[in-house]
Amino acid sequence: MEFDPASLRYDDQGLIPAIAQDAASGEVLMMAWMNAEAVARTLETGRVTYWSRSRQAFWIKGESSGHVQTLVEMRVDCDRDCLLLQVRQEGPACHTNRRTCFYTAIRDGAEVELMAPMV
């Protein structure tokens, strides 16, 4: 059965959340938004392309930073309203220069920083 990006369930702004996960380690790297065209571009090129809500433009991950995400596999959740992108990540995934955007834990009511920026 051929996949059609239009078959996904997008929000009222035409967006769907996409969770990037390191394909080798399983580590969750980040969450960003995609629209149908970003999904199609990602599948066509193998370079993960998101939709930037602040810039209202396509955002090819790593285009300016060099921290490229190459798609290994795209998965659709059971409700078709969220994507899991298994990727090969070059360098840090987070704009703070950390491996993952999820570097802060809440432990005993306090925020704990789990990792420093990569050098």
Curated annotation (Swiss-Prot):
TM ranges are none
Q: What class of enzyme is it?
A: hydrolase
Statement: the UniProt record of this protein carries the keyword Metal-binding: yes
Molecular function GO terms recorded: magnesium ion binding; phosphoribosyl-AMP cyclohydrolase activity; zinc ion binding
Q: Which pathway does this chain act in?
A: Amino-acid biosynthesis; L-histidine biosynthesis; L-histidine from 5-phospho-alpha-D-ribose 1-diphosphate: step 3/9
User: Which residues bind Mg(2+) per the record?
Assistant: 77, 79, 81
Q: Which UniProt keywords apply?
A: Amino-acid biosynthesis, Cytoplasm, Histidine biosynthesis, Hydrolase, Magnesium, Metal-binding, Zinc
Q: Which residues bind Zn(2+)?
A: 78, 94, 101
Reactions catalysed, as given in the entry:
1-(5-phospho-beta-D-ribosyl)-5'-AMP + H2O = 1-(5-phospho-beta-D-ribosyl)-5-[(5-phospho-beta-D-ribosylamino)methylideneamino]imidazole-4-carboxamide
Cross-referenced Gene3D superfamilies, in alphabetical order?
A: Phosphoribosyl-AMP cyclohydrolase (3.10.20.810)
Instruction: Provide one Gene Ontology cellular component.
Output: cytoplasm
Q: What does this protein do?
A: Catalyzes the hydrolysis of the adenine ring of phosphoribosyl-AMP.
What is this protein called in UniProt? Phosphoribosyl-AMP cyclohydrolase
Q: Which organism is it from?
A: Dinoroseobacter shibae (strain DSM 16493 / NCIMB 14021 / DFL 12)
UniProt lists the gene as hisI
